[in-house]
Curated annotation (Swiss-Prot):
The keyword Secreted does not apply. Signal peptide: none annotated. Residues 731-750 have a biased composition (Basic and acidic residues). The modification Phosphothreonine is found at T735. GO terms for cellular component: Golgi apparatus; Golgi membrane; plasma membrane; plasmodesma. This is Hyperosmolality-gated Ca2+ permeable channel 1.8. Pfam families: PHM7_cyt (PF14703), RSN1_7TM (PF02714), RSN1_TM (PF13967). PANTHER family: PROBABLE MEMBRANE PROTEIN DUF221-RELATED, TO DEHYDRATION PROTEIN, PUTATIVE, EXPRESSED-RELATED. InterPro entries: Csc1-like, CSC1/OSCA1-like_7TM, CSC1/OSCA1-like_cyt, Csc1/OSCA1-like_N. Keywords: Calcium, Cell membrane, Golgi apparatus, Ion channel, Ion transport, Membrane, Phosphoprotein, Transmembrane, Transmembrane helix, Transport. Belongs to the CSC1 (TC 1.A.17) family. Residues 751-762 have a biased composition (Polar residues).
Length: 806
């Protein structure tokens, strides 16, 4: 069990590590060569240029020669606090702003309660002496005397703990209500203030019935013209284009090589670039690089055009899914919230995600298999949770060396060394647990994808839910149970079964020492590592040296990342759980929790402003999950305290806690009915008000033209019609120029993107793909440098969307 000395060693190690990370970040961020790594958000919005261009000296292009900036290396902290919440919403979206509010909620809940608990409960716990009399039977440390374990059984002092639990519950519920209300208002205001966006007018229809003699588009068109004649506008069929998407990815690679050799030739016109045609360009016939890749692209485009025509013509590749658009938000909201058919399993409608939020691959999953998939994944997650009990038990064995010493005395020569003992108990357990948890979010996201959800935001929320249950069962309950077993192994083996509940009741509060070490590793050093961005830094420079060939490649190499909701939100909920549970049990843990919330808020604020570029905008759809799991933490805390008092034989005071879970559940039920509907559906009142305002300001608005291809698969995004390859070079050129429109969105707007200019805003450009053969265009680009980039940059869009369907 970790002692005060062990906690001190762990604190020094983690504080020193965090300090080193912050110093390294402060120095690396001001170097010109690293500017794209630490400020990619501003490059994507077009508001920042590389400082290397303005410095004329060779050394100055790589190293910051202004010595004054090294004395203000901590100025990133006040800079991160300057941007207001409304500015963050405009800059990074509502999801990012609401995510930051989780940290401020933690500070608001725990700061006043920490003062109360430290002033009231710590003196009460210390003044008792139960552990002094039990130290021969149990493994205890000085820090455990600050916990409820040190209070004597049947003591009247337990009324103080019950009073603090009541005060904390009422305060937490008050803050949760205020925050839920504020977030709901922010969401509705954000939706009301948005420009026209395709998801506001569109629903996704699944399980379209197969009508003999009718195609899916005809069936959908006829059904909605019949049942929604006043508001139905158009629809977009969905194709299984996963095979074609792979071809798009391969073609993009060829395009990048072609761009690279064209640029290389422009820089040195007197030398013709060449390459070998063999494996990895290491052997084979040496050929003209530009002509070789131009021919490769021409042949590839021919194959892609054939595949595209196959996708559009083959009825087997047309899915029983459609995106149906209406001429008003009200019409779309009514359709999404009502049953469309007397058979409730057909014509299933729901509000459409925004176009960049769609996970296209899962649209091809048959609806009938979704239930089976969810059942299989549910069983798999259950098995995974219990499989991970093994490494959790191993971690707890490291944290409880005294318990092992009594059973295995041969370990004493190693564990008696002070530094080894402090390192093993104070630092290593938290680090080991962090390592074991590292790969889990990715595994759980893959499981969520298998379940068949069609929106990335939903996938991440489902993965986050799985990760939370995992953290609850394994990290919290598993660490307590396994830790208590290892800690008091000698007692369990040498005492009567009737004494085991008393031992558990005394030992559970002592696990706060393990969680303190975990908080310092994950919440202090881990958060400092987040701002350092060591992995993206190394990868960027490796790509810059070996892979980057064009400016487009350099933009891709920046990899700004995004707030990983599937990992960060469950981790946050674990911190809430620890703080809530240990407030009345071991309040000494609260200062460590508060330091985490304050430091993490500062770091993530900086990252959201300067680094992250979100994949999608869900308008804070994750908040009901955050609220619900904090309520669950309150219930766990109350039940745990009841169990502890029962094990302490506090028969007079324990019944006073029975009413608390009932009040908490009643509060949760009220909030669920009061606020959650606004996060599930678009209110008809809001939709109608927005429609009326729009009709008054733009009475001649043509919505059909804007919504026609808003939900076309990204690789078919510019148009949906068959294209015949022309053998004439001039014909090819005309076809390309006519059928490859470039859909641009204002790059200075950083809210959720949309592929339709009139309907959305974006933080980066969206470009459209043309599946016709552009061979003549490549020749023109090769000969006329002024026109080459107009086409070449179009391939970037496919790779942005590739991860969604591949």
């Amino acid at each position: 069990m970790a002692t005060l000395q062990d906690i001190g060693v762990s604190a020094l190690i983690n504080l020193f590590g965090a300090f080193l990370f912050l110093i390294a970040f402060a120095v690396l961020r001001i170097q010109p060569i690293n500017d794209r790594v630490y400020f990619p958000k501003w490059y994507l919005t077009g508001e920042r240029n590389s400082p290397r261009r303005s410095d004329r000296t060779l050394v100055g292009k790589f190293v910051n020669l202004n010595y004054k900036t090294y004395f203000t290396f901590l100025n990133w902290m006040p800079q991160a606090m300057k941007m207001s919440e409304s500015e963050i919403i405009r800059h990074a979206g509502l999801d990012s702003a609401i995510f930051l509010r989780i940290y401020t909620l933690g500070l608001k809940i725990f700061a006043p309660v920490m003062v109360l608990a430290l002033v009231v409960l710590v003196p009460v716990n210390v003044s008792s002496g139960t552990l002094f009399f039990l130290k021969k039977e149990l493994v205890v440390s000085n820090i455990d005397k600050l916990s409820i374990s040190n209070v004597q059984p049947k003591s009247s002092k337990f009324f103080f703990h019950i009073a603090v639990e009541y005060i904390f519950t009422f305060w937490a519920c008050f803050m949760l209500y205020r925050e839920y209300n504020n977030v709901a208002i922010m969401r509705l205001q954000y939706l009301a203030s948005q420009r026209r966006r395709p998801e506001q007018f569109t629903v996704v229809v699944r399980n379209v019935p197969d009508m003999p003699g009718h195609s899916v588009p005809d069936t959908v068109d006829q059904f909605f013209k019949t049942n929604h004649p006043e508001h139905y506008l158009c629809h977009q069929a969905v194709y299984n284009a996963n095979t074609y998407a792979k071809l798009v990815k391969q073609r993009a690679k060829l395009q990048r090589w072609f761009d690279y050799y064209v640029l290389k030739h422009q820089r040195n016109p007197h030398k013709q670039p060449t390459c070998r045609t063999g494996f990895l360009g290491l052997w084979g016939k040496r050929v003209d690089s530009i002509e070789y890749y131009k021919q490769q692209i021409k042949e590839f485009d021919h194959n892609m055009s054939l595949e595209r025509q196959k996708v559009l013509k083959d009825s087997k590749l047309m899915l029983p899914v459609a995106f149906v658009s209406f001429d008003s938000r009200w019409g779309a909201a009514v359709c999404a919230q009502t049953q469309q058919s007397k058979n409730p399993t057909l014509w299933l409608t729901s509000s459409a995600p925004e176009p960049r939020d769609i996970y296209w691959q899962n649209l091809a999953i048959p609806f009938i298999s979704l239930t089976i998939r969810k059942l299989v994944i549910g069983v798999s997650v259950f098995a995974l949770v219990f499989f991970y009990m093994i490494p959790i038990a191993f971690v707890q064995s490291l944290a409880n060396l005294e318990g092992l010493d009594r059973v295995a005395p041969f370990l004493r020569p190693v564990t008696r060394l002070d530094f080894i003992k402090s390192f093993l108990q104070g630092f290593l357990p938290g680090l080991a647990l962090k390592i074991f948890l590292w790969i889990l979010p990715t595994v759980l996201l893959i499981m969520s994808k298998i379940e068949g959800y069609i929106a990335l935001s939903t996938l991440e929320r489902r993965a986050a839910a799985k990760y939370y249950y995992f953290m609850l069962v394994n990290v919290f309950l598993g660490s307590i149970i396994a830790g208590t077993a290892f800690e008091q192994l000698h007692s369990f083996l040498h005492q009567s079964p009737s004494q085991i509940p008393r031992t558990i009741g005394v030992s559970i509060p002592m696990k706060a020492t393990f969680f303190i070490t975990y908080i310092m590793v994950d919440g202090w050093a881990g958060i400092a590592g987040e701002i350092l961005r060591l992995k993206p830094l190394v990868i960027f420079h490796l790509k810059n040296m070996f892979i980057v060939k064009t400016e487009e490649d350099r933009v891709r190499a920046m990899d700004p990342g995004f707030v990983d909701f599937k990992e960060t939100i469950p981790s946050l909920q674990l911190y809430f759980l620890l703080g809530i549970v240990y407030t009345a049990v071991t309040p000494i843990l609260l200062p460590f929790i508060l330091i985490f919330f304050a430091f993490a808020y500062l770091v993530y604020r900086h990252q959201i402003i300067n680094v992250y570029n979100q994949q999608y905008e869900s308008c804070g759809a994750f908040w009901p999950h955050v609220h619900g799991r904090i309520i669950a933490s309150l219930l766990i805390s109350q039940l745990l305290l009841m169990g502890l008092l029962a094990s302490k034989k506090a028969a007079d005071s324990t019944p006073l806690l029975i009413i608390l879970p009932i009040l908490t559940l009643s509060f949760h039920k009220y909030c669920k009915h009061r606020f959650e509907p606004a996060f599930r559906q678009y209110p008809l009142e809001e939709a109608m008000a927005k429609d009326k305002l729009e009709k008054e300001t733009e009475p001649e608005l043509n919505m059909k033209a804007d919504l026609a291809d808003a939900y076309l698969h990204p690789i078919f995004h510019s148009f949906e019609k068959e294209v015949e390859l022309s053998s004439s070079s001039s014909s090819e050129k005309e076809t390309h120029q006519e059928e490859t429109p470039e859909v641009r969105v204002d790059k200075h707007e950083t809210q959720s993107s949309s592929p339709v200019t009139e309907l959305g805003t974006s933080s980066h450009h969206h470009h459209v793909y043309n599946s016709t053969s552009p061979s003549s265009h490549y020749a023109s680009a090769y000969e006329q440098s002024s026109s080459q980039y107009e086409y070449h940059y179009n391939t970037h869009q496919y790779e942005e969307h590739e991860y969604r369907y591949n």
